């Protein structure tokens, strides 16, 4: 074998390449008079990571154990040569091998007898990767399963497998896909029978490549001949040839290296003459698995296999299966199997020979073939050709994949697609490969398939991701919540919670694109159970006439609560009762006439929409809505008739360049940044609607609304009556917006404008109008606030929102909105058009009185529920016969200042306004500013005081400026010191100081470095360190136990010595040295020692102690010897000074 390194992963098997192997041949000899039984060996060979499985050492040449015995015993041999490079990473990783080649020796059996003979061919279980308890064949291996030949009609079987694979990229338990493999099936035949009975039992060979628990594996690239046997009549030898070539396994735990370029040849075998008795041919059981199947065999992609066949009796023909598969890489995922395609296979042939007088039984093999990840469920890789006799389901046509039957609901695979979808077997995501074309009318569904370009999705299925191409509908499901993104050109639908996007999608007229329920032909269809989420339509989306593109579940004309008036729908859809997320359509989608593009629900004139909750809907740059069509974001309607409804709307934005033709409606909800407003009162003509919550509506640059069209945010209609407590959102119209005659551009009670703040009820709304905006006579341009160039005057407790409007804005009558009206300088109100707005100033929390102006006596004013401030700027020209309720001032051809009605302070207008004609009392001047101290006392400029840990100063403008009081930094303490902090009652800052560290013991402080004895244990001494106490225990090395009365303690009362009769005793000694002598008094140890019993922990028993009185201490002394010639000789000796009872085995002191 030749292999590259295994890169990473636990239990990862190194890939192999360039190996070739040849299978040896074997034959059985003739039989004799005695009985013989040939039992071939069971060879279990594993390359990597198999628990409890034997493995062949890399580079080793092994001959499987052979045996030679009496008649009929056959010898078998296996030749394996392997060379390995290092294993790079991972626990349980097997080094890769290379350059291996092996040849199988031949064996033959000696003469047998006329009795029964049994030859057992192998049972080959082949697995590629990661199967628990399942054997695997290394990718690219060519194997011939052991064959058997017995009595009449018994046919031997063989298997040839050749596989080539690309790398397995990532994932735990991921199996590398294989491609380009071809295999040939060896043939076998049985010889004529004789007089004796014979049984052929194939050998059991378990071969696995990687990561199988308890499963043996064959080293990649190794050439192995399974143990062969030759015995009495009819016994045939078996052989296996395996050749593998692999690329590296990249990453992942339990990942199997992919293989490529392998070829193998199958050895042949034949049986000798048999007997006339009964014969049974038991062919091998070949279990082949590719990846991750628990107890389920699978065929490696690209493998060509001929399942072992068996033949018995006259005319019995064995069956075989040839599978050749080519696969793409498996990219990622746990237990994910790469898809395969373009496979072809050839079936090996087998035949049975003539039989004799006995009965014969032929049991063909059971071949279970599985591609990926099915628990106990066999599956065939797409493109595989499989013979009958296997427990597989339907095989698709035209290259389509096959789905298993008998498990959870499996989908049907359809013509024109190379895709297999499974439901309920393994949770995952099913997608259609990019650039794949599915012709119109085709369909590919998970649970339910519909025909005619309309898709139906079961509402009770778990969420998933579906990718749809034009002209057909395709839905799938997955239980994985999260985001899903569709491939460009493929719309997507499903019930999965998350975010989905559409990119440059074209939906053909009459087709449907659903998130949960599909609209067909532009008409609304009810649906339930849709998922909340976000759907966006990106640039270039075109929805033809009659189409419906819906976000959530839609229903037709749902009514809730009492209502009056007829309900009609324009071409498009009216839906209700759904919950959706955020919808956005990006630049240049074109919506043809009669179509509808809804975020949640939409309705046209005289329709009622109830009970919906939407997110944010936006139509961006260049959106074109043809006449009669509607582009709605949330629950919108035009001219809603009477009825009580409660609706919560999201946010809708229409960007610049949007064109709405005559008769169309662009209904959008309001609410800035996805936050809906609340309480807007909108409705149709002469209709009062309460409790509707709206958000923000915005019309972008250059938007053009043609005559008769409407651009509504909260479904606001002309001549409407208000209800108390309305709240508005934020509406902006940028410069250059043109609203043609007869059209309406309604916000939430919205406005054209920018940069200003307005509030209806309590919520603040920002409005403003840019120069050049023109509203033709008869049109509606209703705004929440149109401010004038007014400079706000402040007062105590009042913050007046400053607003501004440029000149040149003309408005028309026939519309009224509650609130304050502010008209800029030079603004002209032309007959037939009314420009109304509402303003509430921040901090006041009131709504200003509205203005109702017009030329007809029938126009009435509107009074708000709260008082506020009303102002008109200078040079305002209004039409005659204006009736005002609240605080307004009107006159023909004169400039009037507003009348102020406010319980608190009132802000005045510009200087010119104060000098013009006035109606009402002038506003009182605010009191002069005064600084107040913490107790309410007045302070003068320059005064400084402290309050609540703040240092306050009265400035020259007589305003109080308070800043947090600055605290001093804590000191830095030295080694052996610690920082002590405390906070005094009269200060806001903590005060810190350093003090020496001490150790507190028994209410006594000890300085660092000091030590003291434990009063309860004199052998323990404590030392005070910077980190705390340190205990020191004194050691008494020579201390032996004795009774308390015989103990003599030292000064610390810790260690002691034992009293005994063993003591030094003086003795006179004559010393002779070099002829010189002297008599000296020395000391010796004299006394008795007590015998004790001690426990020896080494030998686990008691033993007697043998103690002797021996010297314990000594000293050197010098003496002078007298010589015979009268001279002296100095001499030194050791004088014993102490004695004790010591172990005689102890070495004496030196």
Curated annotation (Swiss-Prot):
<dbReference type="InterPro" id="IPR006207">
    <property type="entry name" value="Cys_knot_C"/>
</dbReference>
<feature type="glycosylation site" description="O-linked (GalNAc...) serine; partial">
    <location>
        <position position="124"/>
    </location>
</feature>
<feature type="compositionally biased region" description="Low complexity">
    <location>
        <begin position="208"/>
        <end position="241"/>
    </location>
</feature>
<dbReference type="Pfam" id="PF00007">
    <property type="entry name" value="Cys_knot"/>
</dbReference>
<feature type="glycosylation site" description="O-linked (GalNAc...) serine; partial">
    <location>
        <position position="106"/>
    </location>
</feature>
<feature type="glycosylation site" description="O-linked (GalNAc...) threonine; partial">
    <location>
        <position position="96"/>
    </location>
</feature>
<feature type="compositionally biased region" description="Low complexity">
    <location>
        <begin position="289"/>
        <end position="322"/>
    </location>
</feature>
<feature type="glycosylation site" description="O-linked (GalNAc...) serine; partial">
    <location>
        <position position="46"/>
    </location>
</feature>
<feature type="repeat" description="5">
    <location>
        <begin position="288"/>
        <end position="368"/>
    </location>
</feature>
<protein>
    <recommendedName>
        <fullName>Apomucin</fullName>
    </recommendedName>
</protein>
<feature type="glycosylation site" description="O-linked (GalNAc...) serine; partial">
    <location>
        <position position="87"/>
    </location>
</feature>
<feature type="glycosylation site" description="O-linked (GalNAc...) threonine; partial">
    <location>
        <position position="83"/>
    </location>
</feature>
<feature type="disulfide bond">
    <location>
        <begin position="1085"/>
        <end position="1139"/>
    </location>
</feature>
<feature type="repeat" description="3">
    <location>
        <begin position="126"/>
        <end position="206"/>
    </location>
</feature>
<feature type="region of interest" description="Disordered">
    <location>
        <begin position="776"/>
        <end position="925"/>
    </location>
</feature>
<feature type="glycosylation site" description="O-linked (GalNAc...) serine; partial">
    <location>
        <position position="76"/>
    </location>
</feature>
<feature type="compositionally biased region" description="Low complexity">
    <location>
        <begin position="370"/>
        <end position="396"/>
    </location>
</feature>
<feature type="compositionally biased region" description="Polar residues">
    <location>
        <begin position="507"/>
        <end position="517"/>
    </location>
</feature>
<feature type="region of interest" description="6 X 81 AA tandem repeats">
    <location>
        <begin position="1"/>
        <end position="368"/>
    </location>
</feature>
<dbReference type="InterPro" id="IPR006208">
    <property type="entry name" value="Glyco_hormone_CN"/>
</dbReference>
<feature type="compositionally biased region" description="Polar residues">
    <location>
        <begin position="442"/>
        <end position="459"/>
    </location>
</feature>
<feature type="glycosylation site" description="O-linked (GalNAc...) serine; partial">
    <location>
        <position position="61"/>
    </location>
</feature>
<feature type="repeat" description="1">
    <location>
        <begin position="1"/>
        <end position="44"/>
    </location>
</feature>
<dbReference type="InterPro" id="IPR001007">
    <property type="entry name" value="VWF_dom"/>
</dbReference>
<keyword id="KW-0964">Secreted</keyword>
<feature type="compositionally biased region" description="Polar residues">
    <location>
        <begin position="564"/>
        <end position="586"/>
    </location>
</feature>
<feature type="glycosylation site" description="O-linked (GalNAc...) serine; partial">
    <location>
        <position position="57"/>
    </location>
</feature>
<feature type="disulfide bond">
    <location>
        <begin position="1089"/>
        <end position="1141"/>
    </location>
</feature>
<feature type="compositionally biased region" description="Low complexity">
    <location>
        <begin position="1"/>
        <end position="36"/>
    </location>
</feature>
<feature type="disulfide bond">
    <location>
        <begin position="1062"/>
        <end position="1109"/>
    </location>
</feature>
<feature type="glycosylation site" description="O-linked (GalNAc...) serine; partial">
    <location>
        <position position="107"/>
    </location>
</feature>
<feature type="glycosylation site" description="O-linked (GalNAc...) threonine; partial">
    <location>
        <position position="66"/>
    </location>
</feature>
<feature type="glycosylation site" description="O-linked (GalNAc...) threonine; partial">
    <location>
        <position position="123"/>
    </location>
</feature>
<feature type="compositionally biased region" description="Gly residues">
    <location>
        <begin position="671"/>
        <end position="682"/>
    </location>
</feature>
<feature type="compositionally biased region" description="Low complexity">
    <location>
        <begin position="127"/>
        <end position="160"/>
    </location>
</feature>
<feature type="glycosylation site" description="O-linked (GalNAc...) threonine; partial">
    <location>
        <position position="93"/>
    </location>
</feature>
<feature type="glycosylation site" description="O-linked (GalNAc...) threonine; partial">
    <location>
        <position position="81"/>
    </location>
</feature>
<feature type="glycosylation site" description="O-linked (GalNAc...) serine; partial">
    <location>
        <position position="108"/>
    </location>
</feature>
<feature type="repeat" description="2">
    <location>
        <begin position="45"/>
        <end position="125"/>
    </location>
</feature>
<feature type="glycosylation site" description="O-linked (GalNAc...) threonine; partial">
    <location>
        <position position="94"/>
    </location>
</feature>
<feature type="glycosylation site" description="O-linked (GalNAc...) serine; partial">
    <location>
        <position position="50"/>
    </location>
</feature>
<feature type="compositionally biased region" description="Polar residues">
    <location>
        <begin position="706"/>
        <end position="729"/>
    </location>
</feature>
């Amino acid at each position: 074998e030749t292999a590259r390194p295994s890169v990473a992963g636990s239990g990862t098997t190194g890939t192999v390449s360039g190996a070739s192997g040849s299978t040896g041949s074997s034959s059985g000899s003739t039989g004799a008079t005695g009985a013989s039984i040939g039992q071939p060996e069971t060879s279990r060979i594993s390359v990597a990571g198999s628990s409890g499985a034997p493995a062949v050492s890399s580079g080793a040449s092994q001959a499987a154990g052979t045996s030679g015995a009496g008649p009929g015993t056959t010898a078998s041999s296996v030749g394996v040569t392997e060379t390995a490079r290092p294993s790079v990473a991972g626990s349980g990783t097997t080094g890769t091998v290379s350059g291996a080649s092996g040849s199988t020796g031949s064996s033959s059996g000696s003469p047998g007898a006329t009795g029964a003979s049994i030859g057992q061919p192998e049972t080959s279980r082949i697995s590629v990767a990661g199967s628990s308890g399942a054997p695997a064949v290394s990718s690219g291996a060519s194997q011939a399963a052991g064959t058997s030949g017995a009595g009449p009609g018994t046919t031997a079987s063989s298997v040839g497998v050749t596989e080539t694979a690309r790398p397995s990229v990532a994932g735990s338990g991921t199996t590398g896909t294989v491609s380009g493999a071809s295999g040939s099936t060896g043939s076998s035949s049985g010889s004529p029978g004789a007089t004796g009975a014979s049984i052929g039992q194939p050998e059991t060979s378990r071969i696995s490549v990687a990561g199988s628990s308890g499963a043996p594996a064959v080293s990649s690239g190794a050439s192995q001949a399974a143990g062969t046997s030759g015995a009495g009549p009819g016994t045939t030898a078996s052989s296996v040839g395996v050749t593998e070539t692999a690329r590296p396994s990249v990453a992942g735990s339990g990942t199997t290296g992919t293989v490529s370029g392998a070829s193998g040849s199958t050895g042949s075998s034949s049986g000798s003459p048999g007997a006339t008795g009964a014969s049974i041919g038991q062919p091998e059981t070949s279990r082949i698995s590719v990846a991750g199947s628990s107890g389920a065999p699978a065929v490696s992609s690209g493998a060509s296999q001929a399942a072992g066949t068996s033949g018995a009796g006259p005319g019995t023909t064995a069956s075989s299966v040839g599978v050749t598969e080519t696969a793409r890489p498996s990219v990622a995922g746990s237990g994910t199997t790469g898809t395969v395609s373009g496979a072809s296979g050839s079936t090996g042939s087998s035949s049975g020979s003539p039989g004799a007088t006995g009965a014969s039984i032929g049991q063909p093999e059971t071949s279970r073939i599985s591609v990926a990840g099915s628990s106990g469920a066999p599956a065939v890789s797409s493109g595989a050709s499989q013979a009958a006799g296997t427990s597989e389901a339907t095989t698709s046509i035209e290259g389509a994949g096959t789905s298993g039957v008998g498990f959870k609901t499996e989908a049907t695979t359809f013509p024109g697609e190379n895709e297999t979808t499974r439901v309920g077997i393994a949770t995952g995501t099913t997608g259609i490969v990019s650039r794949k074309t599915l012709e119109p009318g085709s369909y590919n569904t998970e649970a339910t398939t519909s025909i005619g370009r309309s898709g139906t999705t079961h509402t009770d299925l778990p969420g998933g991701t579906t990718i749809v191409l034009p002209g057909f509908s395709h839905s799938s499901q997955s239980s994985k919540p999260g985001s899903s993104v569709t491939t460009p050109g493929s719309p997507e639908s499903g019930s999965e919670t998350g975010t989905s996007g559409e990119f440059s999608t074209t939906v053909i007229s009459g087709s449907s694109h659903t998130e949960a329920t599909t609209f067909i032909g532009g008409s609304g269809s009810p649906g339930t159970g849709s998922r909340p989420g976000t759907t966006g339509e990106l640039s270039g989306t075109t929805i033809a006439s009659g189409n419906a593109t819906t976000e959530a579940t839609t229903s037709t004309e749902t009514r809730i609560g009492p209502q009056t008036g007829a309900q009609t729908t324009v071409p498009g859809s009216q839906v209700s009762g759904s919950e959706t997320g955020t919808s956005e359509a990006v630049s240049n989608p074109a919506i043809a006439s009669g179509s509808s593009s809804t975020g949640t629900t939409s309705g046209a004139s005289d329709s009622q929409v109830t009970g919906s909750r939407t997110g944010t809907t936006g139509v961006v740059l260049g959106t074109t809505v043809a006449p009669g069509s509607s582009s709605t974001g949330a629950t919108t309607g035009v001219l809603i008739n009477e009825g009580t409804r409660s609706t919560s709307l999201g946010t809708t934005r229409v960007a610049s360049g949007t064109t709405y033709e005559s008769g169309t409606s662009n209904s959008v909800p309001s609410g800035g940044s996805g936050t809906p407003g609340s309480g807007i009162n909108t409705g149709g003509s002469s209709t009062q609607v309460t409790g509707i919550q709206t958000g923000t509506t915005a019309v972008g640059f250059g938007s053009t609304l043609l005559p008769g069209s409407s651009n509504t945010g909260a479904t606001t209609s002309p001549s409407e009556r208000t209800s108390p407590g309305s709240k508005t959102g934020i509406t902006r119209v940028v410069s250059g917006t043109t609203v043609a005659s007869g059209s309406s551009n309604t916000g939430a009670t919205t406005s054209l404008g920018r940069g200003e703040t307005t509030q209806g009820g309590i919520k603040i709304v920002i409005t403003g109008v840019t120069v050049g905006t023109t509203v033709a006579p008869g049109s509606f341009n209703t705004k929440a606030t149109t401010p004038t160039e007014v400079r706000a005057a402040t007062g105590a407790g009042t913050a007046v929102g400053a607003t501004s409007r440029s000149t040149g804005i003309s408005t028309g009558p026939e519309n009224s909105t509650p609130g304050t009206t502010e008209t800029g300088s030079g603004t002209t109100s032309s007959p037939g058009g009314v420009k109304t707005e509402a303003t509430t100033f921040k901090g006041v929390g009131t709504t200003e009185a509205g203005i109702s102006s017009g030329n007809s006596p029938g126009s009435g004013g509107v009074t708000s529920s709260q008082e506020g401030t009303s102002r008109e700027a200078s040079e305002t020209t209004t039409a005659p016969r204006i009736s005002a309720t609240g605080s307004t001032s009107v006159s023909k051809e004169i400039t009037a200042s507003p009348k102020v009605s406010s319980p608190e302070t009132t802000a005045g207008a510009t200087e010119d306004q104060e000098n013009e004609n006035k109606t009402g009392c002038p506003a009182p001047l605010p009191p002069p500013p005064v600084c107040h101290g913490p107790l309410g006392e007045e302070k003068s400029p320059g005064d400084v005081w402290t309050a609540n840990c703040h240092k306050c100063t009265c400035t020259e403008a007589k305003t109080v400026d308070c800043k947090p009081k600055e605290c001093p930094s804590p000191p830095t303490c030295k080694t052996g010191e610690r920082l002590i902090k405390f906070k005094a009652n009269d200060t806001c800052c903590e005060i810190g100081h350093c003090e020496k560290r001490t150790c507190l013991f028994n209410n006594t402080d000890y300085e660092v470095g000091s030590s003291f004895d434990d009063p309860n244990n004199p052998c323990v001494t404590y030392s005070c360190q910077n980190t705390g106490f340190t205990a020191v225990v004194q050691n008494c090395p020579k201390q032996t136990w004795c009774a308390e009365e015989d103990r003599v303690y030292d000064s610390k009362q810790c260690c002691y010595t034992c009293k005994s009769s063993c003591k030094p005793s003086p003795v006179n000694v004559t010393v002779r040295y070099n002829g010189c002598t002297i008599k000296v008094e020395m000391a010796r140890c004299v006394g008795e020692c007590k015998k004790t019993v001690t426990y020896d922990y080494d030998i686990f028993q008691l033993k007697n102690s043998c103690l002797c009185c021996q010297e314990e201490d000594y000293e050197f002394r010098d003496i002078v010897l007298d010589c015979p010639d009268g001279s002296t000789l100095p001499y030194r000796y050791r004088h014993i000074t102490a004695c004790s009872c010591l172990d005689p085995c102890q070495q004496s002191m030196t």
